[in-house]
Amino acid sequence: MLLKAASTFSLLNIHGEKKDISPLFSSSSSISSPVSSGKSGNLSFPLRASKSSTTTTSTLSGVVFEPFEEVKKEMDLVPSGQQLSLARHLYSPECEAAVNEQINVEYNVSYVYHALYAYFDRDNVALKGLAKFFKESSVEEREHAELLMEYQNKRGGRVKLQPMVLPQSEFDHPEKGDALYAMELALSLEKLVNEKLLNLHSVASKNDDVQLADFIESVFLNEQVEAIKKISEYVSQLRRLGKGHGTWHFDQELLGAAA
């Protein structure tokens, strides 16, 4: 028994009745045309389309950014009291306290360097190169403290200055001499500052404060490494020279380099 494939038009009965054949022509995107039946034999059939894509108002990710809705929760974070910082945002109390501690470290080191400057500037010591070096070092450490204070205010923290330790006023050493002893003391202080800065950086990392971590990295850490290297070289040179006439020549070289 042979089966013949029926043509599309055979789906219409002989009496001209229309049957729904749209499933044969449905697509994800086409135009719609009505069925018209005029004279016998001139038939047309519908081409129906359905657009399945969403409107273009939604983004490709399906997430619509609504700024006025999302900012509502941020508005609740803006304090209304006059004594509260408006700029503070994602700044933990632990980071704030660590910055204040570093400010105190910088001021204390600056104070020691200022005492060293005063010592070498005496008329009975008269090592002007060392005096100038330690005076500049004192100013540099004070500027570091001021940078930290400025950053504290930027983040909405409160600067709380702490007491400073009274530095010694005599730096002569019976074996090493005053120049070598003072430079070794300076090297120890710079390494201490470096440790404190690394500790501050770890506090920032622990609290996921990338802004504070970036500030410490970009402003302080590389400069601290350079300072340690420079003072290490000065210590090595003074150890070679001893306490004699070579100290004066070292001081003159330092005075010329600092000028």
Curated annotation (Swiss-Prot):
UniProt-listed GO biological process terms: flower development; intracellular iron ion homeostasis; iron ion transport; leaf development; photosynthesis; response to iron ion; response to reactive oxygen species
Name listed for the protein in its UniProt record: Ferritin-3, chloroplastic
Its EC number(s): 1.16.3.1
Similarity comment: Belongs to the ferritin family.
Domain of life: Eukaryota
CDD domains referenced in this protein's UniProt entry, alphabetically: Euk_Ferritin
Region (Extension peptide (EP)): 50-88
Organism classification: Eukaryota, Viridiplantae, Streptophyta, Embryophyta, Tracheophyta
Transit peptide, UniProt annotation: 1-49
